[in-house]
Regions:
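A structured, charge-rich N-terminal accessory region that forms the first stable segment of a protein
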Residues: 1-119
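Short, non-ligating residues that shape and space the ligands of small metal-coordination modules
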Residues: 134-135
Length: 136
């Protein structure tokens, strides 16, 4: 399986989901399936904002493997938020599921039963976005 020629550097505090979307924009990929095929080698992948999985496949395709799994999961997903009060065993299971699995990490961590649900769209602070654009 071929690797990616280009992948944008992850910005401080940036979610992996954002970097994946940025890769699509910068690469001219307009189809979500085309983007997943480019990133994972398979079009049937589903990107999640907070707890992505199959990261071993993605890491294996990146042009620079500086983004080690622990750094990627710990620094660019919401893994820390969802696992802050979980046992070490459950945190390790979630990490492994995100790294190599295709199962639902949300289900494993009990996040699929939240009554409030998840927002229908991503939210952001316009002032913060301007500051980030200036900084990066």
């Amino acid at each position: 399986m071929r690797g990616l020629v280009f992948f944008p550097p992850l910005l401080p505090g940036e979610l992996l989901y954002s970097a994946l979307a940025r890769h699509g924009v910068l690469s001219g990929l307009t189809s979500p399936k085309g983007l997943m095929k480019d990133l994972y080698g398979r079009a049937n992948m589903i990107a999640t904002v907070d707890l992505p999985n199959n990261l071993s496949t993605l890491l294996g395709r990146l042009p620079s493997r500086r983004s080690a799994a622990r750094h990627l999961i710990g620094g660019h997903t919401l893994y820390g938020y969802y696992t802050a009060f979980q046992s070490l065993e459950l945190r390790q299971m979630a990490f492994e599921a995100m790294f190599g699995g295709e199962g639902s990490v949300h289900f494993l961590l009990g996040a699929s039963v939240f009554r409030t649900g998840r927002p229908a769209y991503l939210q952001f602070c316009p002032d913060c976005a301007i500051q980030q654009e200036h900084d990066h």
